[in-house]
Amino acid sequence: MTDNRTLRWFLFAYLALVFVFIFAPIFFSVVFSFNSDRFPTIPLGNFTLKWYQTVWNDPDVWEAARTSLTVSLSTATIATALGFATAYTDYRYSFRLKPIYLGLVLLPPTIPLIIMALAMLAWFAKLGISGQVMSIIIAHSVLTAPFAMAIIRLRLSQMDPSLEAAAWNLGANEWSAMRRVIVPFCRPAIISSFCLTAAVSFDEFAISWFVSGLNKTIPVIILEIVTGNIDPQVRSEEHTSELQSPDHLVCRLLLEK
């Protein structure tokens, strides 16, 4: 009994240290963003909100937020649809080249981002769409679709195959069975895939930096601000981007219009 209690406390302490290690940099970044001094110093200078005001009044930041929101929501929609289609194909059908099919579907996350970004840049330049928002959406969809596929495929593996067969026996065609049986069963995985792919797209930097052109996203504009200087504006912008929910951004953009 004593050994179990000791092990439990050890695991709790280890978990607490892991969370401290993960969240401490974020916490100190938020603290220093309220510092009036340009450089992070201890003890802190006077309390100020001017860095947040600078970010709020910067039109480039809001343009980047608009671009990031558009890209992330579009990417999440496309990636989730592709992920559902590929997951259902893997679940429903058996064919000779299925291992190759799955290998190609799951390949993008295994490729280094720099290599993928350079390949995407060359491909988009050849197609004549380099630097457009559409190119960012396509690149992010290729990167994130495998994550959606993995989540939805895991959910499909928990479904009884006889459910779909029962729908067919009751007169439903394939599309009706898909709409009334498969999609409702996969709804939690679809929602999870949408949220995950949107978050990955919103935070993705390497590919965005190569293919975005003048359509900068939040990670790209943060790099531009931080390059060559250390500014509390960057820390306030990072903290603000973490707190900006899609609802808040939508309301802000609608008010501007």
Regions found by a protein language model. Name each.
Residues 1-59, 63-66, 70:
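N-terminal, non-cleaved signal-anchor transmembrane helix
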Residues 13-14, 19-26, 135, 142, ...:
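Transmembrane alpha-helices
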Residues 4, 8-15, 85-119, 164:
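Cytoplasmic-entry segments and transmembrane alpha-helices of multi-pass inner-membrane transporters
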Residues 65, 90, 107, 162-170, ...:
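Short hydrophobic faces within alpha-helices
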Residues 40, 44, 49, 98, ...:
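Membrane-interfacial helix termini and adjacent extracytoplasmic/periplasmic loops
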Residues 2-7, 37-39, 52-60, 202-241:
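Interhelical loop and adjacent transmembrane-helix boundary motif
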Residues 59-90:
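Transmembrane alpha-helix signature in integral membrane proteins
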Residues 238-257:
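Single conserved hydrophobic/aromatic residue that forms the stacking wall/gate
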